[in-house]
């Protein structure tokens, strides 16, 4: 019996020592590699100490606990020196060490070490308590947060356009893209009482022939007592706004295939034909119409009252947007965002497949007669004469920069503001023409009636990073030095928010040109400077090895090694064969969700994101031909291997992830924040989202901590001093106090909420609605839900 116990004791000590040995060898070898690359000396030193602990454990010496206590305390001090009291940044530096330290102080472990050492157990207990105290302090004192309070002062601003208070008739509520509602039945005091009012299921789910990038991004619109929305496959639904009951639906019969880079619909547009702006036959046929963009390059006009096609529009209600395109392969040109609608014109643009080849459709922007569908004008950004009207002999220009995000419109100026993308291929630009460069990654202002250029402002010169203008711009009239200035806020992937006078494109907030890293790939070039707006969420400092992260110190070490192997000299580091760290990454700090502006309080709500990517140029060679194989199609995704046929390099584009699939950059990856537009200062900024739905195993209960998750979708704000946002990689809709960022309410969604919510009033009751259908490439739960929330009748 005694011999058996002795064997068990030796086995326990041996296993403990073997774990310490594994840790020590891993840290020593990996750490030595990191030091060779120019990284931190901590890891090899920690590895040597762990090997010392291993030797003592094998020899049965309790002094191992003394040495381990010293390692633990030194690690915590080093961690705070590197990242401050940031709980999530300290976690991978300490988690394995803390858990192993707890193991060592268990009586059945240390008592099996026969060689005594005075105070060893107590020393390790003290080290663990100090470490725990430091982590606890960090958990309640987040250095990344900004904790100010917005002024509650509000001066009613003259509206740029008139919208009934209870309606939400356009993607951004108004075509100025403000995403602000004057409703206040739901307010900061009672929002905690919100309950689910109704749920509608569209029945539109992922199909076997869909690409991975199938997404549910719609923001419904509401006119009168009806809600109008499109699904991922662009099926159009009209719902009773009070009950969620279907009134009618229309199916355009989208024929997608896995090569489509997107299958999505962000929204639809509404137009009312009246006797003073439309022919009598149009008014009789289709007085109220929904304009529906479809991913295969068609545009539908549907009667808003009954769901039937408007016979007097284009070809019996269907407009072919592929007409005069130089390439007409389905899925290469995709209108994914709702068009701008004026009394005369439909202004529509679309996405062009990223990084496929030098022979792709044009990114032309067109104006069609809103009643008949006749082409009124064209603005082809890559043509010598952008306004040249095509003919049977003249097609639009290959690979013109496109505008895939929603546009904004000022009816008083009759100007439409288009956020422009870059000429594709995106990540190598040595072959681009001056015309292709001219309007790329810019804000372009066009006369909505004629298509003539009013002005343009370029936010990235010779863009090699896919730093499109990704968001609907927001228009507002803001007090600047005692004067009211009509401005446009243009959020960029870089984190900059460019603020321009929307009459002429002149900067209102300075955006000085600053030097950027040099040294492009062979045959390409980079500009010496780029504009940096003074109003910005871009990172305040470049990434370093200290910013690398992981679930443990083991994968954090791998991330640090990879970081030092990549080319990175800060924002705008050129693409390379070595592999370039792109931060902000290809998703951008801002995406299609945009920002919300309260024009009365003159404040903005934003949800910036911080997630690095890695791009790597692949020279042509075997398996990587210059020209596309016959019948080659797109990859159906924006990440992974992208061929870039026609230029000297293919490219791989991927998030910068650890071996466990976690971001290599430490959290937060997503924030909710408020800006004072009078001072252009960030007043408050909070992490948003938990990893509840990003874990490798189901987590049925709500996690009690906020990490700051990646997100897609935007915020809305209301006169009730409450903002709403879904968007995060966990399945929640949340409400925050606009003044200070306090979370007031959240509701679990049945699927991913990667969409921007909206709010409206019907029959005296205010509702908040969001699409919960998930996002394919974001890996959130897919579904087909439209969910509405309202206050119970006794809680208003």
Task: Give the ranges of each region predicted by the language model.
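Topology signature of small-to-medium multi-pass alpha-helical membrane proteins
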Residues: 1-149
């Amino acid at each position: 019996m005694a011999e058996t116990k002795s064997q068990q004791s030796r086995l326990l000590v041996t296993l403990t020592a073997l774990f310490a040995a594994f840790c020590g060898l891993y840290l020593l070898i990996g750490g030595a590699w990191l030091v060779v690359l120019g990284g931190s000396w901590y890891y090899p030193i920690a590895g040597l100490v762990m090997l010392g602990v291993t030797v003592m454990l094998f020899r049965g010496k309790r002094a191992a606990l003394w040495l381990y206590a010293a390692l633990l305390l030194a690690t915590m001090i080093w961690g705070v020196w590197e990242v401050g009291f940031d709980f999530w940044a300290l976690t991978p530096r300490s988690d394995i060490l803390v858990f192993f330290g707890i193991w060592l102080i268990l009586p059945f472990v240390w008592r099996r070490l026969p060689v005594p050492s005075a105070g060893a157990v107590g020393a390790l207990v003290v080290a663990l308590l100090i470490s725990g105290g430091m982590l606890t302090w960090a958990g309640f004192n987040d250095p990344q947060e900004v904790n100010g309070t917005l002024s509650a002062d509000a001066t009613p601003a003259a509206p740029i356009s008139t919208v009934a208070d209870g309606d939400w008739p356009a993607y951004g509520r108004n075509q100025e893209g403000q995403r602000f509602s004057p409703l206040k039945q739901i307010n900061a005091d009672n929002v905690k009482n919100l309950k689910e009012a109704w749920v509608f299921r569209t029945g539109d789910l992922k199909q076997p022939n869909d690409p991975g990038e199938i997404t549910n991004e719609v923001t419904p619109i509401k006119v009168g007592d009806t809600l109008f929305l499109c699904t991922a496959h662009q099926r159009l639904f009209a719902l009773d706004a009070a009950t969620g009951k279907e009134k009618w639906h229309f199916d355009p019969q989208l024929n997608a295939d896995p090569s489509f880079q997107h299958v999505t619909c962000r929204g639809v547009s509404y137009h009312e034909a009246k006797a003073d702006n439309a022919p009598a036959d149009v008014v009789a046929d289709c007085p109220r119409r929904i304009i529906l963009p479809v991913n295969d390059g068609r545009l539908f006009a549907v009667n808003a009252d009954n769901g039937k096609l408007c016979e007097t529009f284009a070809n019996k209600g269907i407009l072919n947007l592929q007409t005069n395109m130089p390439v007409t392969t389905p899925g290469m040109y995709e209108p994914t965002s709702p068009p701008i609608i004026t009394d005369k014109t439909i202004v529509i643009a679309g996405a062009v497949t990223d990084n496929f080849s030098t022979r792709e459709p044009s990114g032309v922007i067109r104006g069609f007669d809103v009643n008949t569908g006749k082409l009124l004008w064209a603005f082809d950004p890559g043509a010598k004469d952008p306004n040249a009207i095509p003919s049977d002999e003249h097609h639009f220009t290959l690979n013109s920069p496109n505008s895939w995000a929603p546009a904004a419109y000022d009816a008083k100026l009759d100007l439409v503001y288009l956020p422009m993308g870059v000429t594709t291929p995106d990540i190598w630009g040595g072959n681009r023409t001056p015309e292709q460069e001219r309007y790329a990654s810019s804000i372009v202002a066009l006369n909505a009636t004629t298509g003539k250029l009013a002005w343009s402002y370029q936010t990235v010169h010779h863009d090699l990073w896919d730093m499109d203008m990704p968001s609907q711009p927001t228009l507002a009239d803001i007090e600047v030095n005692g004067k009211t200035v009509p401005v446009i806020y243009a959020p960029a992937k870089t984190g900059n928010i460019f603020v321009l006078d929307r009459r002429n494109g002149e900067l209102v907030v300075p955006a000085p040109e600053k030097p950027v890293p040099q040294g492009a790939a062979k045959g390409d070039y980079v500009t010496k400077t780029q504009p940096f707006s003074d109003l910005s969420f871009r990172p305040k400092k470049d990434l370093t090895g200290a910013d690398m992260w992981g679930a443990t110190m083991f994968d954090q070490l791998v991330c640090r090694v990879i970081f030092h192997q990549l080319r990175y000299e800060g924002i705008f580091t050129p693409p390379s064969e070595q592999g370039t760290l792109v931060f902000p990454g290809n998703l951008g700090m801002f995406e299609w969700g945009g920002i919300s502006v309260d024009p009365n309080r003159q404040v903005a709500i934003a949800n910036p994101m911080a997630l690095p990517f890695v791009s790597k140029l692949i020279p042509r060679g075997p398996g990587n031909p210059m020209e596309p194989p016959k019948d080659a199609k797109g990859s159906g995704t924006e990440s992974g291997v992208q061929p870039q046929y026609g230029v000297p390099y293919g490219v791989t584009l991927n998030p910068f992830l650890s071996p466990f699939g976690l971001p290599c950059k430490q959290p937060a990856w997503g924030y909710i924040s408020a800006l004072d537009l009078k001072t252009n200062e960030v007043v408050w900024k909070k992490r948003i989202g938990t990893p509840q739905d990003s874990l490798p195993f189901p987590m049925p209960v709500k996690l009690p901590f906020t990490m700051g998750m990646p997100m897609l979708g935007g915020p809305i704000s209301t006169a009730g001093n409450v903002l709403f946002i879904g968007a995060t990689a966990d399945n929640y809709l949340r409400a925050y106090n606009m003044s200070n960022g306090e979370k007031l309410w959240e509701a679990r969604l049945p699927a991913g909420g990667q969409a921007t919510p909206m709010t409206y009033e019907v029959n005296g009751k205010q509702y908040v609605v969001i699409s919960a259908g998930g996002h394919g490439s974001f890996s959130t739960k897919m579904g087909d839900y439209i969910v509405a929330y309202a206050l119970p009748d006794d809680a208003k």
